[in-house]
Amino acid sequence: MDDNKRKSLDAALKSLDKTFGKGTILRLGDKEVEQIDSIGTGSVGLDLALGIGGIPKGRIVEIYGPESSGKTTLTLHIIAECQKAGGVCAFIDAEHALDVKYAKNLGVNTDDLYVSQPDFGEQALEIVETIARSGAVDLIVVDSVAALTPKAEIEGDMGDQHVGLQARLMSQALRKLTGIVHKMNTTVIFINQIRIKIGATGYGTPETTTGGNALKFYASVRLDVRKIATLKQNEEPIGNRVKVKVVKNKVAPPFRQAEFDVMFGEGLSREGELIDYGVKLDIVDKSGAWFSYKDKKLGQGRENSKAFLKENPEIADEITKAIQNSMGIEGMISGSEDDEGEE
């Protein structure tokens, strides 16, 4: 760059710093590239699929899928992991359906969880903005976008047309929220439902998410959660096999997938993942129906091995660390013992 251009640019930068504050615009070469902090999801496989050890801090995240696919369960596990790392969490229960007992079973410290049950969409998003601006909350969950009903629709008569109101509400809110959450390093998770597009024909999926297109654009990470099988024991359903696809990722390569068990009343099965990934990475040995780790037999069959790991958390922790070492994600996951020790 020649001297005249440099002087003009320096004058412009000084003017911007004076008007908006120091650091308004920086040259990337002058600033060390920061590693993106993350919040663990409670799933080793999903933390790996996300590429940074969990969901990114200071970003907007969308988790969507059909009903009863495990969206809220996954989100409650993320809250539990955030709390383990010393984070403060808030749950905006627009659906008025939070099961406190189930949240406790999943490891959420409900005594320290801030919960709001707003009456209409504008109120919910105003609450999100206010607590995000405080800079004191690490994670805010909104359950769900479909339940963010505009005030005009609630106060109107049944059958009134309110075309595009919710989409405009979401677009306006997200324009404001994006900068706030980045500045305050607060993560906002929106849980969303899927709908079938009316009159959809030809190629591509007929499915779409509620609340318009704004969330698709503003979200740094979008997770598609699907139930792929029912887990049974003695012909009795005991849980679901769930697949999560990272359909959008601005902080790491997208389109990776993770699968895990979600057990009824217990949530995500960490032990099931340890066996699956342990076998895949040759950390856990499988001989016939028997599973073993080093010189210890874990059990005959997957369910018995899961039960053994649940009763022996020290062995489960050892296998977890071995998997993280093998995958190269050790120390990336918030809430790990190493992270707690550093704090």
Curated annotation (Swiss-Prot):
Query: GO cellular-component terms in the record?
Result: cytosol
Keyword Cell membrane among UniProt keywords = no
| Bridged cysteine pairs (disulfide) | none
| InterPro entries, per the entry | AAA+_ATPase (IPR003593), DNA_recomb/repair_RecA (IPR013765), DNA_recomb/repair_RecA_CS (IPR020584), P-loop_NTPase (IPR027417), RecA-like_C (IPR049261), RecA-like_N (IPR049428), RecA_ATP-bd (IPR020588), RecA_C_sf (IPR023400)
Q: Which SMART domains does the record match to this protein?
A: AAA
**What are the entry keywords?**
ATP-binding, Cytoplasm, DNA damage, DNA recombination, DNA repair, DNA-binding, Nucleotide-binding, SOS response
| Family of the protein in this entry | Belongs to the RecA family.
Alphabetized NCBIfam families for the sequence: tigrfam_recA
| Name of the protein this chain belongs to | Protein RecA
